[in-house]
């Protein structure tokens, strides 16, 4: 288990996402092959808040799910770095998604994802995103790794 701080540069070495779609700010803890704890700091300056909703900004649920999927992709990367680094990790499916609490500007989203199953390049994760100790979202997500060149076919 690693609780050493993980730099943004290292996060970016596993994830191809960049602003405004890189939704993980920090990794708090990683247990290879088991789980990851990550943080997304929610800022009013994020572009989606201009229209969702102008008088009552709420982080879109699909972006909470995307942050959870990115945390899962990072767990895959730390579990098997040789087969994930330099690959694209594609979001394949969402199951059992439930939204329990709105996520607002100023909140810190604490994301915990657990590896449920892996079969070659297909990964299944389960987890939750929490705000102030309360579950904001829970879901299972599936992802698949592919070489970057194969992704354009």
Curated annotation (Swiss-Prot):
Keywords: Cytoplasm, Lipid A biosynthesis, Lipid biosynthesis, Lipid metabolism, Lyase
GO biological process entries: fatty acid biosynthetic process; lipid A biosynthetic process
Localization terms from the record: Cytoplasm
Pfam families in alphabetical order: FabA (PF07977)
SUPFAM superfamilies: Thioesterase/thiol ester dehydrase-isomerase
InterPro entries on file: FabA_FabZ, FabZ, HotDog_dom_sf
CC annotations in GO: cytoplasm; membrane
Active site: 52
E.C. code: 4.2.1.59
Entry coiled-coil feature ranges: none
Keyword check for Secreted: no
GO molecular function terms attached to this record: (3R)-hydroxyacyl-[acyl-carrier-protein] dehydratase activity
Role played: Involved in unsaturated fatty acids biosynthesis. Catalyzes the dehydration of short chain beta-hydroxyacyl-ACPs and long chain saturated and unsaturated beta-hydroxyacyl-ACPs.
Family: Belongs to the thioester dehydratase family. FabZ subfamily.
This protein's name: 3-hydroxyacyl-[acyl-carrier-protein] dehydratase FabZ
Annotated organism of origin: Magnetococcus marinus (strain ATCC BAA-1437 / JCM 17883 / MC-1)
Phylogenetic placement of the source organism: Bacteria, Pseudomonadati, Pseudomonadota, Alphaproteobacteria, Magnetococcales
């Amino acid at each position: 288990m690693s609780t050493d701080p993980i730099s943004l540069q290292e996060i970016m070495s596993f994830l191809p996402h960049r602003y405004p779609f890189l939704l993980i700010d920090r990794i708090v803890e990683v247990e290879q092959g088991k789980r990851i704890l990550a943080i997304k700091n929610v800022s009013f300056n994020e572009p989606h808040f201009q229209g969702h909703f102008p008088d009552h900004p709420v982080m879109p649920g699909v972006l909470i799910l995307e942050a959870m999927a990115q945390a899962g992709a990072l767990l895959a990367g730390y579990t098997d770095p040789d087969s994930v680094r330099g690959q694209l990790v594609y979001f394949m499916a969402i199951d059992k998604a439930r939204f329990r609490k709105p996520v607002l500007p100023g909140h810190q989203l604490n994301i915990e994802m657990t590896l449920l199953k892996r079969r070659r390049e297909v990964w299944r994760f389960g987890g939750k995103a929490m705000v102030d100790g309360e579950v904001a979202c829970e879901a299972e997500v599936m992802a698949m790794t592919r070489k970057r060149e194969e992704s354009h076919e």
